[in-house]
Amino acid sequence: FLFSLHCGAQKGQLMSVSVYNQSTAIPFTRFVTTPVHPGFQVAAEFDLNDRPHGRAFTAAHLGYFYHGHLAQGFYVGGDLGYETRTRFGLSFCGMIGVGYLRTYVTQPEYIFQNGSYVRRPDKGNGRLMPSLSLETGYYFKPARRSTQLFVRYQSWGEYPYSPGFIELMSHINLHLGVRFTLGKDTSAE
């Protein structure tokens, strides 16, 4: 109900969809990593302050990644961001965020029980997911809510990862995405 009221007030919902490569790495030490561990993310954005050459916004997102030798994860979270835009369509953006991550192993795990090893059921692990993102993009038209292609470098952590051993596991995601308005946009009218 509240989501529909907010969408109606904006006359079209600003959305982003991205695919990305996920990696366990120290932030800002790598840009492109191999092998590829695929993921995707969908977000709804809500402007807080929209000016001709910049905007402050919040975003609610959900996503998934698959890291074949480690885990697969489902997450939901939010971001606070600021984007600046040039007259010819180039944009730069920074975001800080926090979310909840639920991971599940991708390989069988075993425990020693009653003198033998038995497969352990995976109920998943919940973790806090703080993040910092830098983004550049290009808007195809000068309209405030025109379609945009973007590249985002996101560093994030899993906390607690392995208490008593590795408290925080750092990750990076390299996103390629599109930002667009879903529904009729009459905000310029």
Regions found by a protein language model. Give the residues of each.
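Bacterial Sec-dependent N-terminal signal peptides
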Residues: F1-S16, L182, T186-E189
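Short glycine/proline- and aromatic-enriched beta-strand/turn motifs that initiate or cap beta-hairpins
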Residues: G8-A60
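Transmembrane beta-barrel strands of outer-membrane/channel proteins
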Residues: M15-S23, T58-Y64, G78, G94-R102, ...
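Sequence/structural signature of outer-membrane beta-barrel proteins
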Residues: Q22-F28, D47, R51, L62-H69, ...
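Solvent-exposed loop/turn segments connecting transmembrane beta-strands
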Residues: F28-G39, P52-H53, G63-G73, F88, ...
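Short connector loops at helix/strand junctions that flank enzyme active sites
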Residues: H37-G39, R55-F57, A71-G77, R87-C93, ...
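Outer-membrane beta-barrel transmembrane domain signature
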Residues: G81-E189
